[in-house]
């Protein structure tokens, strides 16, 4: 019987695998290049640990270090002395600046590494840093514009925000790959994601699913982080697949 389905065969370069099918190849590339992705993913993990340590206990509205006097004689009954509280405020401000700067740099390097890994290009920190110097400010502008557009969409109604998220999901990879401007990257992302909207929704759905693992007590946060890290190349893979279709 003649083949009547319009879907591409699995052996075809135009075949789009399901979002879950991307987990294994993504995991393999992450582990193969762990000397690059390991340090890059360690940075947000450190940020997460810091956030967890300084978050209030859910039932008592104090930080965990408020009970540290039971752990060491070096701690007083009060969480911190008055001068220490001011140090914490200053430290928090410095930490915010550190997160803004280091987090953005790591974000750019990570997305560049993801794209290079998919394209089978050699990964080095020198080349990733060159990408930051070459496209850093442009990508920062793209992140800001994307954040504003998607944020306004969610403020108006949830649905427009989701649509904007889907449309511009691949914009950073377009800019990294094609060296485009902000508007061109967003327009190209909208064009690519329109080729197969389900392929983008699928990846977003799996990412959300892994994020929900965080609600599991005790181990949920770590499990969510590990699963998300192993699946992190899926967006770059989708970009590569849809680019071949265009």
Q: What is each model feature region?
A:
Residues 2-246:
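Hydrophobic alpha-helical membrane segments
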């Amino acid at each position: 019987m003649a083949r009547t389905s319009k879907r591409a065969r699995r052996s075809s370069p135009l075949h789009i695998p399901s979002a879950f099918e991307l987990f294994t190849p993504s995991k393999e590339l992450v582990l193969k290049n762990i000397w690059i992705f390991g340090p890059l993913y360690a940075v947000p993990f450190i940020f997460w640990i810091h956030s967890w340590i300084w978050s209030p206990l859910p039932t008592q509205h104090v930080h965990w270090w408020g009970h540290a006097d039971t752990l060491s004689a070096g701690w007083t009954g009060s969480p911190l002395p008055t001068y220490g509280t001011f140090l914490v405020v200053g430290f928090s401000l410095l930490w915010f600046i550190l997160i803004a700067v280091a987090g953005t740099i790591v974000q750019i390097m990570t997305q560049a590494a993801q794209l290079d890994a998919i394209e089978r290009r050699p990964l080095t920190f020198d080349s990733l840093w060159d990408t930051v110097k070459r496209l850093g400010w442009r990508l920062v502008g793209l992140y800001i514009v994307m954040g504003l557009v998607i944020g306004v969409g969610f403020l108006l109604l949830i649905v427009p925000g989701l649509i904007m998220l889907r449309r511009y999901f691949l914009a950073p990879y377009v800019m990294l790959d094609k060296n485009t401007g902000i508007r061109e990257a967003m327009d190209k992302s909208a064009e690519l994601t329109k080729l197969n909207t389900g392929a983008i929704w699928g990846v977003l759905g799996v990412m959300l699913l892994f994020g929900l693992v965080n609600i599991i007590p005790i181990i949920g946060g770590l499990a969510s982080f590990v699963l998300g890290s192993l699946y992190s190349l899926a967006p770059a893979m989708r970009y590569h697949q849809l680019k071949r279709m265009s």
